[in-house]
C-alpha cells in the first residue's frame, strides 16, 4: 500500500540504497565529469636513457627515448622547460645521463614543482641487482641505487609516476612506492637481469588506440601498463619461450605490486592518472573554485579506489560508501558548474 503524505515522514528509510537511486546519482555525477576528471596542475617529465653497453642497445634505447619524447612534446604539448631529457651521448638540449646531472635535474624540479603538479620519471637502459634487496640503474659513470633515487624523489612536492623499464627493476618498486605514487617495473624480481622488451610496448601504448581500453580517448597509466604487459606476454609466446619478464604496478604504497592480470587492490590511482595535461584542469585564479576542483579530483580518486575494493567489501558497506561518494561528487560538481 502506498504511503500518504501524512505518514510519509514517519516511514523508515530503506536499509540499502536502491540500484535505481545509485544509478541516478552516477548519471548526475557523470554530467559534470568534463569539468574535472583528474587532478589539476602542471605535468613534468624526466626521461633518462643510461649507459647502453653496446651499439645495438644504444640504438634501441635512443629509438624508444626519441619516440616517447616526441609523444610528450607533440601529442601532449609538454613545454620545453618541463621536460628534462638525459642520454648516454650529449646532443642539443640533452645532457649526458650522469649521476651529477640526475641530481641537478631533481634539484631543479624540487624548486619548480608544487603540490598540484605531476612528475613522470621514465628510465630506459640496463639495471643491475646488488643483493636481491637493492638494484642500480646504469648511468654514464657512477650509478645511482634504488635507495638513492628514492632519496632524490622524497623532497618533491606533487604526485609521482615512476616507470623503470630495465632488468632487475623490482627493487625500485619496493624502494619508491608510496602514497600518491604510481610505480611500474619491468620485472617482478631483482634476479631477472636480462634485457627487457617492456619499454618497447610501454612507449607504443600512448600512440596505439588499442591501449585506450575504456574508449575515453585518453590512455591512463593503468591502460599503458596493461597494454605493455600484454605485449610482453605475446612477445614471449611468439618466441616460444617461457616468460621471464613480469611487469608490476604499485599505486597503494605497499611496495608489493601486482601484475595486470591480477591487480588486487592496485590500479585505482593508475586508472585516473594521465600523462597529458588538460587545459580544462588548469587551476583558476578564483581560490574557491580551485579548492572545489581539487576536492573533486580527490573524490574521483576515492571512487576508483572504492571500485577496486568492491570484491572484498561487504555489499551493504559498498553500497553505502558508493552512495556517499556519488552524492558528494554531484554536490561539488554542481558548485563547480555554477562558478565556471
Regions of interest found by a model, annotated:
Residues 66, 160-253:
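Active-site-proximal C-terminal subdomain of hydrolase catalytic domains
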Residues 37-120, 127, 134-136, 143, ...:
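Boundary/activation segment at the start of structured domains
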Residues 56, 60-67, 71, 97, ...:
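Extracytoplasmic/secreted proteins, especially bacterial periplasmic and envelope-associated proteins
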Residues 51-59, 88-96, 134-140, 186-192, ...:
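Second-shell loop/turn segments in exported
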Residues 4-34:
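Short, low-complexity, charge-dense intrinsically disordered segments
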Residues 53, 66-80, 107-114, 154-158, ...:
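Sec-exported extracytoplasmic/periplasmic mature domains
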Residues 36-43, 58, 241-340:
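Disordered regulatory segments flanking catalytic cores
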